[in-house]
Curated annotation (Swiss-Prot):
Coiled coil: none annotated. Its cofactor is pyridoxal 5'-phosphate. The keyword Amino-acid biosynthesis applies. Catalyzes the conversion of O-succinyl-L-serine into cysteine, the last step in the cysteine biosynthesis pathway. Can also use O-acetyl-L-serine. Its EC number is 2.5.1.-, 2.5.1.47. The keyword Phosphoprotein does not apply. GO terms for cellular component: cytoplasm; mitochondrion. This is Cysteine synthase 1. It is an enzyme of class 2 (transferase). Belongs to the cysteine synthase/cystathionine beta-synthase family. The lineage of its organism: Eukaryota, Fungi, Dikarya, Ascomycota, Taphrinomycotina. It comes from the Eukaryota. The modification N6-(pyridoxal phosphate)lysine is found at residue 54. Its main location: mitochondrion.
Length: 351
């Protein structure tokens, strides 16, 4: 049963930035829960100290590098990231005495790039290139680390320390917060660490009872890969969402691939309307990937049926995307303005 009102029971004193990571609330989305007859619960990962779910993985991949002797004090953390992992890494770099170098696609919001620079990171926005291309931002990050003394490429996409962060923290938190009543889990994947770690934990803890569905944006290969068992992967299309979707099966997804029960492709039209609906009806200002995840949770609830408890992830807030998602010209450029429901157009206040 969800508690109401402002809560006064809080964790005790924690040690620094890293001590503040995790233990995020699980929010019941009341209007959607009432509409579906299910409990739709969303993990408020935007409450992590760096502002996103990626703080968990950022800490674990740095700790992994330290344990393996790849990184010592004064060294350099190097990563390829769409933004949020980089922000988490930059915070941790400041806290632990490292330099931080980030390579990222030049399609990401300027707010993400600026935030990384504010945190002292060296940022290299590079043209978008597929993973098979040596100019892909991840490969450029790897080469930078290889050519820099005392530098470690943390390899968030294939380093299973990412998966482990969610297997050891996010998954157990969800299980404890729902008192083991969770019936379904769904979220999108970028690296796949959140989806994989939570799926692995909930499957093991429930003896396979908890269903796990991948939520995929247009332009990502996972939906078609799962639906055709890898025979006809298709990544046609594109999405306004940032940091999710994938053109391959990453090293974090591979270990749980056979545990995936189903996949859903979520069109941008539904995600953008959910962005405004959550603001309008729930008072939640979230990023595009979070809104896609909530659409997926609603779809999963309809599939599982009334009375079920479905959990998803609220990856980050909407602040880094505001200049785009409240902009008529941006929405028109993505062919989204005309599909937004009339009652939500009052929020589009930027030219």
């Amino acid at each position: 049963m969800a508690t109401s009102g402002i809560q006064t029971k809080v964790p005790g004193i924690v040690s620094g930035f890293i001590g503040a990571i995790g233990r995020t609330p699980l929010i019941r989305l009341n209007t959607l829960s009432n509409e579906t007859g299910c409990n739709i619960l969303a993990k408020a990962e935007f409450q992590n100290p760096g502002g996103s779910v990626k703080d968990r993985a950022a800490y674990y991949v740095v700790r992994d590098a330290e344990k393996k002797g790849k990184l010592s004090r004064g060294g350099t953390i190097v990563e390829g990231t769409a933004g949020n992992t980089g922000i988490g890494l930059a915070h941790i770099a400041r806290a632990r005495g490292y330099k931080c170098v980030i390579y990222m696609p030049n399609t990401q919001s300027q707010a993400k790039i600026d935030t990384l620079k504010f945190l002292g990171a060296e940022v290299h926005p590079v043209p978008v290139a597929p993973f098979s291309n040596p100019l892909n931002y991840n490969h450029q990050a790897r080469r930078h680390a290889e050519s820099t003394p005392n530098a470690s490429w943390t390899d968030q996409f294939d380093n299973v320390a990412n998966l482990l962060s969610h297997y050891e923290t996010t998954g157990p938190e969800i299980w404890d917060q729902t008192k083991g009543t969770v019936d379904g889990f769904t979220c999108s994947t970028g690296t796949g660490g959140t989806f994989a770690g939570v799926t692995k934990y909930l499957k093991e803890k429930s003896d396979g009872r908890v269903a796990s569905f991948v939520a995929d944006p247009p332009g990502s290969v996972l939906y078609s890969h799962i639906k055709t068992k890898g025979k006809h992967p298709d990544n046609k299309g594109s999405s306004f969402t940032e940091g999710i979707g994938q053109g391959r099966i990453t090293g974090n997804v591979q270990p749980v691939y056979d545990l995936i029960d189903d996949a859903m492709k979520i069109p941008d039209e539904k995600s953008i309307n959910m962005f405004f609906r959550l603001l309008d009806q729930e008072g939640l200002f979230l990023g595009g990937s979070s809104c896609l995840n909530v659409v997926a949770a609603v779809e999963m609830a309809k599939i599982l049926g009334p009375g079920k408890t479905v959990v998803t992830i609220l990856c980050d807030s909407g602040h880094k995307y505001a200049t785009r998602l409240f902009s008529r010209s941006f929405l028109e450029s993505k062919k989204l303005f005309d599909v937004i429901e009339p009652q939500y157009k009052k929020y589009i206040v930027l030219p």
